[in-house]
């Protein structure tokens, strides 16, 4: 290995020695290492870049650069000063011509000629790498002395150049909108434009919004204006500066060029707009008359410094040739737009997602992520999980469980202090309301299905106990446990079976729970969770989409049921209000209109004065009863107005749809243009809570009697016929205890499928979880909690897909310092145990918060249900493909799979997924819903059968490739091919293999050498010079 490295270094040194001669006759453009069609050798520049970027280095990655372009300009007709005219982090921002503001960030458009001239500047100028200096005067002194020694600058020019480089610096700063009258007066008095071009072509500057500082006092500390600059929020803490100084002077006959990289980044006073240390300096001073050329060269070097690949090369370069090779690489990747088809003055908006530079870097650093000859499978980062460490079968007793514990134990402490964020509070409130609503809904349905043997209070207690324990000790604390539809169906069938056969329902259920928990523990001990690797995107998206559709369907179903209970009287007419009436009459018209008070007194208390007066006679007038009381005691409502319900349904739908719409709008508020970034992020984090508060307030303000949240106010079992502990023996024959193992097997399949599919969805690669999964540990705790819930006659709990996805979405983290114009990058999810634990503790305490919770309208919570269902469908590929069915091909988005898979195959795949989803929906809506988990398992078989209808190439883009037994063998073969294959950055877009050798293209630069560098040349000279084809007819 060392001999190969020495060989490469010798070759690079040979290139360095001949670099100047070569560069003066030709421009080597690296064609992504192997693009040339004329030669089969690797270009020296490409080898150089590969050596630079592929070098093993234990030092941290180079920091982010802030690049500032300062130009030498006359301000208000006064002395020449350095004026900041543009800046870069990722995108270019210019000072607008009015001088009042910065432009919007935009993609820097450069002229190809300025890039060529920049390359020549690096060739001919002074290059000082790893210079040890602590101040700007010291840097300037070293640079000037170096130029004098090399004969590039006359000694008598030293004083003039030094004085020019140490002139005042003015930075563009933002001022408050609330300015004083004096400031306004100054602005009016200096109405000249920022770039007004006089006869000599030298721009002059206005005096507005400028901060001026002289560096003659050699102050290395940032001034107050720098420290107050809010632009620092856009930069990471370890950011460094790259300063570009360009301008024209009247005392130079040839350009003064220098590129400096300091050994250590140094604070150079107020040289930079923001108080960050300077690492790079590029200086270009030239004769008068070419200010525009200097400006464009300055923009070119500044843009290169913001390019990730050249940025790394600039930090690692060891000599001039390394920098030239970096420019050549940039020129190879640059795109040229025809002048007649594009206006260069148009500012290109930054893209929503930036292309990754990893492909360019790996192309030279020899990364493992390269595709060779197009035979590597597709992986877009969200692919399969067959190679996941958590799903490797150990072959030992409880081996997977032990590994899960070892993997999660080091993070246990951090799982608590990582929750210290305001975002955690918003997640707690959001998930709490969703969990409470879910507990009440399923508790009510469970009470109806089991004649209140399990009800709302049991649902609250079971949710609190199971959820809190799981979040504290489970393998994936981001997973939220809840009751599910299949469990509810099983409970209903089990209760009816027990009732028909005179079995003790709770005892029978206890034994089923014990058997199921035992079977789950067997699955844990045998590492059965490795089967999860066969759950591909097809299965996961089918399951998650179905649950999301159920949430959406149930939300509308509940609202329609509410509309039936509070019907709209469409025949009501305001003009006929005098004719509308409603009265309560006794059940038997033959009797007196008086009713025995003693019957009523045992069940209700009348609050009217009239009833109190009549209590002495022991009777009450029927006409004084309310509608509910009248119906309760068998009375008759007579009148045309008895069915009129004022505005409840309409108001409920307003609250329902309003909560959903407001939640969606506020959640997207983070990317809006209103308010500062911090305010937008805060509003987005608390979107659901704000929506609930807004519409709860609206409901209270209007005073319409909409149905409210009903929470149990007493801590006791719903049914008086049961306690908090179920005795295991005595209620059923002995053989029932053994027979319970058969239905328990069905429950085990249900629990295993629900838990593991939700776990797979939560742990997908696109969520960027860093603390690892714990499939075996999750199933272990679900089994233990099933035992506890069975003994306490509480509902069984398993991972809830939609609420878990909502929990993850509420904890997503993005970069706090994103460059202007750059979309915040998704960093991952705030992995911790606090939010889930607090949510479930609050759920248990909700019994004592009934006086507060009773003010929340149910339609508002149904709106939250709708939001959770719709939000969990975002980013699901199945939904994207479903929309393609309604789009003409020319309007379809540029999805990666549409580039590689024929559209008819995409539609066929979607159609099969829709058919499977429809069958699952029909199944869950019938009595056969008890075998729902088995049908989910059948999706894996359906996906396996697709291998006979779709090629592996198509499935690699539309789905995940199912793991194979001989995968390791195939990977070894692939690595052998990689050693023999060629590297191509565009191989993924082409099915044609490229030559094995790596060529280069050399474009002669004689035309540019014929022109004097950066000084006037006559048009006639250029016209008489031979063209490229004339001098190279052999080509």
Swiss-Prot record:
Membrane-spanning parts: 422-446, 457-475, 477-497, 506-526, 541-564, 649-666, 682-701, 736-763, 776-792, 794-811, 834-850, 858-874
InterPro entries: Band3_cytoplasmic_dom, HCO3_transpt-like_TM_dom, HCO3_transpt_euk, Na/HCO3_transpt, PTrfase/Anion_transptr
Residue numbers on the Cytoplasmic membrane side: 1-421, 476, 527-540, 667-681, 764-775, 812-833, 875-916, 943-1035
MF annotations from Gene Ontology: monoatomic anion transmembrane transporter activity; sodium:bicarbonate symporter activity; solute:inorganic anion antiporter activity
UniProt membrane topology term: Multi-pass membrane protein
Disordered: annotated segments: 192-222, 348-389, 968-1035
Keyword flag Glycoprotein: yes
Quaternary context: Homodimer.
Protein name stated in the entry: Electrogenic sodium bicarbonate cotransporter 1
Underlying gene: SLC4A4
